[in-house]
């Protein structure tokens, strides 16, 4: 029911208000089957990918998203990589546990996390699809932001207070 309301609101924004530059970003798509179901439900509610320029972007924030990136991209127009969740779920830790516990090991620059992110970027670039990143990592680590640019990321979301530090 809530999803139907969200779709109705998006339809109104795009059709009635003419804001066709507004796109849909779908979070936490766990499986290919779930991607199919979400796309199908949206279509039944009047939001069809490609219709009136509608782009569907998937949050790539679960290791399975990176592992099966090529298959997920069959259903979406690109990824926004959620580096916080990708790091937590790849390393099996919680960044909010307190620095004295597990959070001290929370680092987007860990080789396993970089592998997942690079795999996701490469899949998007190979298919000529959008790829951006959101999360704390590029704001906290200028070297990570530079690495992302070298890998071909399309956009990087930064916290406003860190723009000067990463300049």
PLM features: residue spans?
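Conserved alpha/beta-domain cores
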Residues: 1-167
């Amino acid at each position: 029911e809530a999803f139907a309301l969200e779709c109705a609101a998006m339809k109104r924004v795009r059709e009635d208000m003419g804001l066709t530059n507004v796109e849909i970003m779908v979070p936490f798509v766990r499986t290919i089957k779930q991607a199919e179901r979400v796309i199908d439900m949206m279509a039944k509610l009047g939001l069809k990918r490609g219709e009136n320029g509608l782009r569907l972007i998937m949050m790539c924030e679960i290791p399975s998203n990176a592992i099966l990136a090529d298959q997920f991209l069959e259903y979406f127009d690109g990824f926004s990589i959620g580096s916080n969740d990708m790091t937590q779920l790849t390393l099996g830790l919680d960044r909010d546990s307190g620095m004295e516990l597990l959070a001290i090991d929370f680092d987007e620059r860990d080789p396993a996390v970089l592998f997942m992110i690079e795999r996701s970027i490469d899949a998007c670039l190979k298919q000529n699809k959008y790829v951006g990143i959101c999360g704390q990592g590029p704001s906290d680590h200028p070297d990570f932001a530079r690495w992302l640019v070298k890998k071909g990321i399309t956009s990087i979301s930064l916290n406003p207070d860190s723009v000067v530090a990463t300049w």
